[in-house]
Amino acid sequence: MTFYDHTAIEPKWQAFWADNHTFKTGTDASKPKFYALDMFPYPSGAGLHVGHPEGYTATDILSRFKRAQGHNVLHPMGWDAFGLPAEQYAMDTGNDPAEFTAENIANFKRQINALGFSYDWDREVNTTDPNYYKWTQWIFTKLYEKGLAYEAEVPVNWVEELGTAIANEEVLPDGTSERGGYPVVRKPMRQWMLKITAYAERLLEDLEEVDWPESIKDMQRNWIGKSTGANVTFKVKDTDKDFTVFTTRPDTLFGATYAVLAPEHALVDAITTADQAEAVADYKRQASLKSDLARTDLAKEKTGVWTGSYAINPVNGNEMPVWIADYVLASYGTGAIMAVPAHDERDWEFAKQFNLDIIPVLEGGNVEEAAFTEDGLHINSGFLDGLDKASAIAKMVEWLEAEGVGNEKVTYRLRDWLFSRQRYWGEPIPIIHWEDGTSTAVPESELPLVLPVTKDIRPSGTGESPLANVTDWLEVTREDGVKGRRETNTMPQWAGSSWYYLRYIDPHNTEKLADEELLKQWLPVDIYVGGAEHAVLHLLYARFWHKVLYDLGVVPTKEPFQKLFNQGMILGTSYRDSRGALVATDKVEKRDGSFFHLETGEELEQAPAKMSKSLKNVVNPDDVVEQYGADTLRVYEMFMGPLDASIAWSEEGLEGSRKFLDRVYRLVTTKEIVAENSGALDKVYNETVKAVTEQVDQMKFNTAIAQLMVFVNAANKEDKLFSDYAKGFVQLIAPFAPHLGEELWQALTASGESISYVPWPSYDESKLVENDVEIVVQIKGKVKAKLVVAKDLSREELQEVALANEKVQAEIAGKDIIKVIAVPNKLVNIVIK
């Protein structure tokens, strides 16, 4: 039996593509453009895992498809190479992070090339290259000039073990750091901030302009957190002090019975009475040790301390005790709230705990038992009595403004972006602080401000970065003799990744970030593929920088990424015991189709879980490529199920994909190829061209592969294969299995040219008219899908089409298929356990 030799074929075509610059980006201005972007990887020491190629294969299929359709295609790759892991590794091992990073990049590049991706390597970028970060620094200077980068003394999330402050987004719900799982404490420090809040409304509005998953848009909307309400000013009794609260429910002001300030609020010390001073100071100290997430956890016990002072409720003159409590954050809103315990669960719990008044102002519920949080007509509310919510809000805002004690207000949950890191391995911030108290940006002519090479990269522990120790770099003197110090903080890893897609467009430009005409030609990115874990941070930061650059006239579009697609996660094979605990794969043996714990003998349940070193279920793509070939890995990952689904890795599935490619190879190399068309394959061939074209365009790669299988089955039943159909079929499969595609194209044409730019096959509508039939797919006897398929499909073909269907895939995910009963032209019944 004939098999294709991937160990010979794949390196041969990889060398051909490299030698011939096959995937150099097209520049023919008469052609349409297609910009396919992958989220570039952080080059870790571990190398690629099989999750990386899933998204990369998807963009590669699209890129190859669009080239064949006559587009100029920009399909680049680069490295997000600054950041904590390399620095941490360097400190642990004594290695230079630059050397470690360069080795990792070389390994990643080797692995990526072995998978046959059609990247234009002339456009490779590396965020740690001074020629790249010159422009990261240039963008920072523009932010600084526009007042969007500023210094502030802010309470930060300090991680002693990392020697740096981290952003709110990098703190886990349990109050530890995302990287390393270390304790996080709050401490005030001088930090660089970026004023992303100035763009809050545009970041919200322009989500309507892009084709993104609604779930991702919702995550960004929630993060931006727009609220419409009112600011209300409360005077502190017997003082000249006052404070402002923002509330979305000014209509409930008659029910406000106490106020709560954040422990860090500027007013706290001024209004705390002598007999409460010690308790307040003690409480402030405890609050400083908690992260924002820990403080605002709804499930935690309510704590607080009375300041000894009272505020005056402006609408009824009632006295309201002023408390401090850690669930109110100084960084959120005004750092103060009016508490309406009758209609807010957290306020109600607090009021019950500390025996504070609870006055209902909305009809309904029993506020002695629980807070009433639904809507009702107003009661106990003077001039608002009997009004509904909308009318009462409008009337109260009118009253507040007339009395001069409040006004209508729109607020956002979004906070400014904490931009500085007290670490070595990042872009230096191009600012000089002079001894006369002024600060200036490093002029463009002196950029890049290069990160100095130093042996001592341990955190200083003082809150400054290790750059504070490099005195010959640190200290500068102006022409007028004034001395200065360079900024020692560095930028976060998010900086370089906020604009890299722009540099790919013109990566070697030494005069500007990128040429305007090229930016006009290529923007926006047509498809951006990456993990949903970047839904908020990276995507929000990149959109923010893009909008700033749009305002500066640098980029021609309001949004960077027109379409976003999140691939699912590839889960590892893993096992659970009766307690639900995961068991490492090296502790498991298979007997008679079941799985047992090697040490205890307990029978285990197979349960897919995220691949991890501890479970010993990480699959290295190098091993798969060596055993099965890159084309098999690509086809398998695209055929596993819908691209956005999370699916378990399966060795059997891999073997199935390899067998399919062997059948393809045999079909084209051993079948008699003839110049005359018998017509026997007219319908299935034209159906296949139509289906694959439409499904690739919609990124439904699994159903496209299922249709290719249908064609192979049909063609194998014929003695001869019409040469045009053989060529067309090879073109259809080439984006999925490019090495095999090239090899078979040469077998059919001997052209010596790559298949990459051969025009995509078209189909003949008139050949599709033969009757289709609707079949039903049943699982456990219940109809789960109805499919329209070609009449007279064999049992095997019917089974393949049914099992590739998205609805069916969802139903059978993670379950054992006992048998499949296919009745041609009628139904498919799937029996699962």
Curated annotation (Swiss-Prot):
Gene Ontology biological process terms from the UniProt entry: leucyl-tRNA aminoacylation
Compartments reported by the entry: Cytoplasm
Binding, ATP: 613
Short motif ('KMSKS' region): ranges: 610-614
Keywords associated with the record: Aminoacyl-tRNA synthetase, ATP-binding, Cytoplasm, Ligase, Nucleotide-binding, Protein biosynthesis
Membrane-spanning segments: none
GO MF entries: aminoacyl-tRNA deacylase activity; ATP binding; leucine-tRNA ligase activity
GO CC terms in record: cytosol
Name recorded for this polypeptide: Leucine--tRNA ligase
Organism per entry: Streptococcus pyogenes serotype M18 (strain MGAS8232)
Annotated gene: leuS
